[in-house]
Each structure stands twice: as C-alpha cells, then as structure tokens.
C-alpha cells in the first residue's frame, strides 16, 4: 500500500511533464532543449543530494565497475524514454501523449520474462526467470480500457500523420522506461539507493544530453528564457521529485512482480492529472461523459490495486 501511494504521488509530479512540454511546444520551443535541459538541470540537484550523503565516490566506483551496463541501460531508461516524449509534444496534445504513455501499464509486465533472479531451492542456487503476472495484467486491462475511452472523443479529430508522430515515439518510450529502470535495479542489486541510482543514470547520459543541446543550438539557435524556465520546472517536479518517488516505490517491491506491476500501473493517473492541469493552465474544456467513464475505470483499477495485498486472488480466480 505504501509503494502504491508513493506511485500515485509520483504520477502527480510526472503529469507536469506532459502539461509543461505542451506549453513549451505551443510557445515554439524545440524538443532538443525540452529534453536535454531537463537532465542537465537535474544533475546539480542530484549531485548535491549524493554529496551530502557522502556517497559520491561509491557511486562513481560502481559505475566504473559496470561501465557498459550503466551506459546502455541508463540510455535506454532515460534517453530513449524522454527524447520521444518531448519530440511528440510538437505533434500532439499533452493529454493524448500522457494517455498513450500508459502503455507502460502493459509493457512493464510483458517485459517480465527478460529478467531473472537467483533463488535457493533445496539448498542450491537456481536462476529463475520472471513470469508475466497475468492477474495483474487483467487488472491493468481495466485501466487500459479506461485510457482508450478517454482518448476516443478527441483522437477522432486528429489527422493520421499527427497521430503517428505522437503515437510511435511514445510507444518506444513506454517500453524503454520500464526496461531501463528494471535493468538498472538489477545492475545496482541493492547496493545503491534510489537517489544514487538516478544520479548515476543522469551522469552517464550527460554526454548524450550535451550533444542534443549543441545540435539544438546549431539548428534552432539558443533556447528562449521562457523555455529555460519551463524546462527547469519539469526538471525539478518531474525529473527530481517524480523520478525519485517512482524509483523508490518500484525499489520497495522489486522482488514481487505483481506488486511491481501495481506500482507501475499507478502512472495511469497521469492522464487524470494531465487533463486537470491542461484545463487549468491551457483552458482546455472539461472531458465529456464518455471520457469521464474512462476516468472512472482508471480509478476502479487503481482501487483494486490498492487493496491487492488484502484480496485472495486464489478465491477470485478459483472458479474461472
């Protein structure tokens, strides 16, 4: 329950990404700066946190020992996650991006067989491959249907080319984020805390963000002061607060695939928060009745997940 509540809070701060990225795109800001500045701004904050804890050398040593794994999975979890999101913001609305992003509800569970763990069976260490948590997948399906329903009224008004430019990059991001996050949890194997892991991932991907920023300057010129401020807001609320909260929540339940799926599913509430945010900040209209049905399904799915530890799935599925 604790991990789920933290996940919900993370979803609230993550929603800032979709709303503010939409605002930046409306103001003519380039995705080069929206993506790179977020992580460039994140690094000093994270470094300060790790420095205060006196863990800087330990993190750097861990990176040195696992350089290849750190770079590959940090790039997958951060670069292949955020570049597509900011790119899509130039072609789609924040609510549609946040809705499409909820494919992570399903992708995280589909990726489960890619991960293994070592367990002791009859006194011997045995490598066991994770299985897809089908029960959690069923609950997530309820939420996913709700997300689809939310998008139907608005998506029907969008041209196909804009839909594809907004959808395909997010599809990549939706698989990259949980894959990178879970792989990095395996790499650190509990040796680093959440903030230390996020700091390390941001640090090793810094060269990529710098290159993206330079390319943006060469193609678009320097970013406007408003985009810099907005990117800073995203870095603080989504990059620092939301990322740390979410990674902390997933770390709590990392050894339980169903609970891990439940935490990842809390991110579906980003859609609700994004809709509210765009109504307040961008003046978008209140969703119609069909969309509200979708919101209700998302909330129902979250309620089921919230009490997952108190429900005997064996009794529920016994006769199915």
Regions found by a protein language model. Give the residues of each.
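Hydrophobic/aromatic residues within transmembrane alpha-helices
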Residues: 24, 34, 87-89, 114-116, ...
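Glycine-/small-residue-enriched transmembrane alpha-helix faces in small-molecule transporters
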Residues: 1-37, 140-141, 145-148, 156-186, ...
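Specific transmembrane alpha-helical segments of multi-pass solute transporters/efflux pumps
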Residues: 13, 56-101, 149, 237-255
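C-terminal-most transmembrane helix of multi-pass membrane proteins
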Residues: 119-122, 258-320
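Hydrophobic alpha-helical transmembrane segments in multi-pass integral membrane proteins
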Residues: 14-16, 80-86, 145-158, 205-220, ...
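Transmembrane alpha-helices of multi-pass small-molecule transport proteins
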Residues: 27-80, 107-114, 142, 175-179, ...
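Hydrophobic transmembrane alpha-helices of multi-pass small-molecule transport proteins
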Residues: 46, 113, 131-154, 289-309
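Specific alpha-helical transmembrane segments that line the substrate/conduction pathway
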Residues: 33, 40, 86-131, 258-280
């Amino acid at each position: 329950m604790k991990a789920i509540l933290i996940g919900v809070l993370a979803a609230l701060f993550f929603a800032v990404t979709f709303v503010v990225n939409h605002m930046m795109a409306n103001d003519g800001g380039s995705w080069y700066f929206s993506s790179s500045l977020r992580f460039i701004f994140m690094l000093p904050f994270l470094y300060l946190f790790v420095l205060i804890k006196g863990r800087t050398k330990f993190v750097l040593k861990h990176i040195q020992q696992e350089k290849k794994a750190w770079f590959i999975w940090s790039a997958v979890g951060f670069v292949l996650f955020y570049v597509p999101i900011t790119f899509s913001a130039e072609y789609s609305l924040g609510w549609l991006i946040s809705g499409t992003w909820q494919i992570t509800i399903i992708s995280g569970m589909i990726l489960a067989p890619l991960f293994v763990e070592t367990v002791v069976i009859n006194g011997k260490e045995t490598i066991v491959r994770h299985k897809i948590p089908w029960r959690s997948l069923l609950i997530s399906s309820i939420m996913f249907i709700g997300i689809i329903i939310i998008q139907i009224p608005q998506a029907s008004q969008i041209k196909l080319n804009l839909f594809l430019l907004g959808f395909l990059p997010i599809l990549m991001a939706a698989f990259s984020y949980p894959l990178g996050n879970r792989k990095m949890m395996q790499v650190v194997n509990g040796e680093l805390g959440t903030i230390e892991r996020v700091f390390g991932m941001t640090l090793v991907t810094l060269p990529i963000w710098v290159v993206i920023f330079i390319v943006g300057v060469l193609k678009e010129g320097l970013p406007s002061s408003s985009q810099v401020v907005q990117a800073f807001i995203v870095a603080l609320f989504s990059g620092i607060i939301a990322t740390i909260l979410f990674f902390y929540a997933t770390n709590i339940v990392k050894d339980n695939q169903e609970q891990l799926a439940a935490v990842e599913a809390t991110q579906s509430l980003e859609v609700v928060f994004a809709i509210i945010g765009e109504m307040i900040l961008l003046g978008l209209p209140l969703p119609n009745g069909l969309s509200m049905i979708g919101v209700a399904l998302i909330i129902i799915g979250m309620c089921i997940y919230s009490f997952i530890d108190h429900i005997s799935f064996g009794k529920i599925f016994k006769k199915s």
